[in-house]
Regions:
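Alpha-helical structural context detector biased toward long hydrophobic helices
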Residues: 1-191
Length: 191
């Protein structure tokens, strides 16, 4: 019998892009840790950072106000752990035909979840809910009724919806698995 997954964590700094991926986009800088270049869309500026500091959000995957401090961080760690050797194999052999069905499944899960786990996805969901609540308010629906209709927590926090959708990726996984896959590579002179 399998042991139930412990969904509690003390991890505060949580990456929206796993470090093992970020390290592939970084280079050692003389006398310093590895660096990569990032672009802040909101501020419109590029800057250098490290894989440890890039794409970090504090307690981003934690369920707020949960009595047992549940978090999706441990589950995301499992997906990363499963996909990391598959991605390493692709980088080493540069041949997507080597993927087994199990490898393809692990990679499809990882890609589907990766698409859904970003801060941008949270903002997209928040924006969509804001538009919907405005439309409902224009039709005379109270804020409480709108929140109930949209499945919002009493405080109207869209993060609960974001966290729920993060683990509901079955249709996206199936969609990815139904596609033909190709491996593309860029060169350092033309990244």
């Amino acid at each position: 019998m399998t042991e139930p997954l412990n969904l509690r964590t003390d991890v505060v700094r949580q990456h929206t892009v796993p470090r093992f991926l970020l390290k592939h986009f970084s280079k050692p800088v003389k006398g310093k840790r590895q660096r990569l270049h990032a672009f802040d869309k909101a501020a419109g500026r590029a800057y250098a950072t490290t894989p440890d500091d890039a794409t970090v959000r504090n307690t981003f995957y934690n369920f707020d106000n949960h009595p047992q401090r549940f978090s999706l961080e441990p589950l995301l760690g499992i997906y990363e752990h499963d996909a990391a050797p598959v991605i390493a194999g692709l980088l080493e052999h540069k041949d997507i035909r080597r993927l087994t069905e199990d490898d393809r499944y692990k990679l499809a899960v990882f890609v589907a979840v990766q698409r859904a786990r970003t801060f941008g996805e949270l903002e997209r969901i928040s924006g969509m809910i804001s538009v919907l609540t405005d439309k409902l308010a224009a039709m005379g629906v109270t804020e409480e009724q709108a929140g109930e209709t949209l499945g919002l927590s009493p405080g109207g926090d869209t993060r609960d919806i974001f966290l729920r959708q993060l683990v509901q990726q079955v249709s996206h996984i199936k969609h990815l698995l139904s596609k033909d896959w190709y491996l593309l590579e860029t060169r350092p002179e033309h990244p």
